[in-house]
């Protein structure tokens, strides 16, 4: 085991504070409408230009192990805020820096660190409750567009396209962000449910000009196994042929003799049929088949529940209005599933989303929920260069997270004003002792930090602006973009309550832990000696030079 270096007390905290300030100073330059960009060097390709706090934080590693620990802890604040709300990373970093700087001054002055933390925690709980009471519902397109615009660094085109996407696919619908090929942002919406599996054979195509297979008023057979023997399929194929309707088979796979027979039947016009693989693998495939079944009123044919393919009847088949298959995707239009079943499945998936701790599982569950609850919208980001494209795409993704958070928990006045207004919740708050009171007062000063930083980045005097905002009430605040005071909501400067809340909670949590640090342990960095010169072997053959 490598030898360790241990630092105690003030010397440990001073080192940690250096790391905190290096990272926070780089991140906070991006805050507000007049925040600056940060250029990140990449090991290959062009540098990345960003105004996204968490992207800047992730790039920072310091040479000194103890300073780096401080930087990594603040990086965790940004990540926590990003994981919960998808935005507010810069605000969280600024708050954490203020809490740590104020807290370590109090510790140096002889206050008890544990009581300081308890005071900070008490004040945080009160401010979070006040933020929730200040929040107003965010339901109309105008408010959604304003939230998206603010989060996308005051880019109205991004706010508007997100509002339009939400309007088309609903609050639960899937909205994905992709790199476009043009200069302008584009929005395309897929009605109905889509999954990423295309036709198994090009011989199923019935629209050669567009290379798609379109099935009108079809029947849908869902099978949770591979189909290779055509005999299993014959009873259901005969019943479908008598009905005169087209058929789509969705199975784990359709191969060999079974696929060849389906192709021949389709080409001869005996049964208009197509086949695709079921989306996903193993348990996810079973779950997706169940979602398709609920949406279309079908029953999944699975031997695990006692249903064999030979016993399948028309009653087991789904009845969507139309199906469109291309090489990569299958789209189900207007499934005929019972509304009560769809609502029950939506409620169950929502419960699973709340309970899961895995980001990947949550993403897949939300995808499944969206397939049941709404359509799919794709925002294609347009830009002139690849560097601009990456920067713009990151802003669109941040804005999308912010608007989802706003719809979830409502909006509060933006520009750091909500935190200043929430201070009224701790006006008369008292701790159990004087050190806890110092912790409460410390947080009171720290929550002004985001407003101060926004004003400083805009080139104005922070103290003057903070005093004027404090004298006002309600939504009164400072518009850093135009330099005027007024009603923040009316000026369209909104923040999602969830973003502000999670930024404060993450900053208080990590900030409080850093204040209570008394010792730090790190590996000793050994300077590697320069390699020795190779043995020259007596420099043979050079004896006659003397």
From Swiss-Prot:
Gene3D superfamilies: GroEL, GroEL-like equatorial domain, TCP-1-like chaperonin intermediate domain. It comes from the Bacteria. It catalyses: ATP + H2O + a folded polypeptide = ADP + phosphate + an unfolded polypeptide. Signal peptide: none annotated. The keyword Membrane does not apply. Its main location: cytoplasm. It is an enzyme of class 5 (isomerase). GO terms for biological process: protein refolding. The keyword RNA-binding does not apply. ATP binds at residues 30-33, 51, 87-91, 415, 479-481, 495. Pfam families: Cpn60_TCP1 (PF00118). Belongs to the chaperonin (HSP60) family. Forms a cylinder of 14 subunits composed of two heptameric rings stacked back-to-back. Interacts with the co-chaperonin GroES. This is Chaperonin GroEL. The lineage of its organism: Bacteria, Pseudomonadati, Pseudomonadota, Gammaproteobacteria, Pseudomonadales. The gene is groEL.
């Amino acid at each position: 085991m490598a030898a360790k270096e241990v630092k105690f007390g003030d010397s440990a905290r001073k080192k940690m504070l250096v790391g905190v300030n290096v990272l926070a100073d780089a991140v906070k330059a991006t805050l507000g409408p007049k925040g600056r960009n940060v250029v990140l060097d990449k090991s290959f390709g062009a540098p990345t230009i960003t105004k996204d706090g968490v992207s800047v934080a992730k790039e920072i590693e310091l040479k000194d192990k103890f300073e780096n620990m401080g930087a990594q802890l603040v990086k965790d604040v940004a990540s926590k805020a990003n994981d919960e709300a998808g935005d507010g990373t810069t605000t969280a970093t600024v708050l954490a820096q203020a809490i740590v700087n104020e807290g370590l001054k109090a510790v140096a002055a002889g206050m008890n660190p544990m009581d300081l933390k308890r005071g900070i925690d008490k004040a945080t709980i009160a401010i979070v409750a006040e933020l929730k009471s200040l929040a107003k519902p965010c339901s109309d397109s105008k408010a959604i567009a304003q939230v998206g615009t603010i989060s996308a660094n005051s880019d109205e085109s991004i706010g508007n396209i997100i509002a339009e996407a939400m309007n088309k696919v609903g609050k639960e619908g899937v909205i994905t962000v992709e790199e476009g090929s043009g200069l302008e942002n584009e929005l395309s919406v897929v009605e109905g449910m889509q999954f990423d599996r295309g036709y198994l054979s090009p011989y199923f195509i019935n629209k050669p000009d567009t290379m798609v297979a379109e099935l009108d008023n079809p029947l849908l057979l869902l099978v949770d196994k591979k189909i290779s023997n055509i005999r299993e399929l014959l009873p259901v194929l005969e019943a479908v042929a008598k009905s005169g309707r087209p058929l789509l088979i969705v199975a784990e796979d359709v191969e060999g003799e079974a696929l060849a027979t389906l192709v021949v039947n389709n080409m001869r016009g005996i049964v208009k049929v197509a086949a695709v693989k079921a989306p996903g693998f193993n348990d996810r495939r079973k779950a997706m088949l169940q979602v398709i079944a609920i949406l279309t009123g079908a029953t999944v044919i699975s031997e695990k529940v006692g249903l064999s393919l030979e016993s399948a009847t028309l009653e087991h088949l789904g009845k969507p209005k139309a199906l469109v298959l291309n090489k990569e995707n299958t789209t189900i239009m207007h499934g005929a599933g019972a509304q009560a079943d769809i609502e029950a499945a939506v409620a169950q998936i929502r419960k699973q989303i709340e309970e899961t701790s895995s980001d990947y599982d949550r993403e897949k569950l939300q995808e499944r929920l969206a397939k049941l609850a709404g359509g799919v919208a794709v925002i294609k980001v347009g830009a002139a260069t690849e560097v601009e494209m990456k920067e713009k795409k990151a802003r669109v993704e941040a804005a999308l997270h912010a608007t989802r958070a706003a719809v979830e928990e409502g909006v509060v006045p933006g520009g750091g004003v909500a935190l200043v207004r929430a201070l009224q919740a701790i006006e008369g708050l008292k701790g159990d002792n004087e050190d806890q009171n110092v912790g409460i007062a410390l947080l009171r000063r720290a929550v002004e930090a985001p407003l101060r930083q926004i004003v400083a980045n805009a080139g104005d005097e922070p103290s003057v602006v903070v005093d004027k905002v404090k004298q006002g009430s309600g939504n009164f605040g400072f518009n850093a973009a135009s330099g005027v005071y007024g009603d923040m909501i009316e000026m369209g400067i909104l923040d999602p309550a969830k973003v502000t809340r999670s930024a404060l909670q993450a900053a208080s949590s990590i900030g409080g832990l850093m204040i209570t640090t008394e010792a730090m342990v790190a590996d000793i960095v050994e300077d590697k000696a320069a390699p020795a010169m190779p043995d020259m072997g007596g420099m043979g053959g050079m004896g006659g030079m003397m």
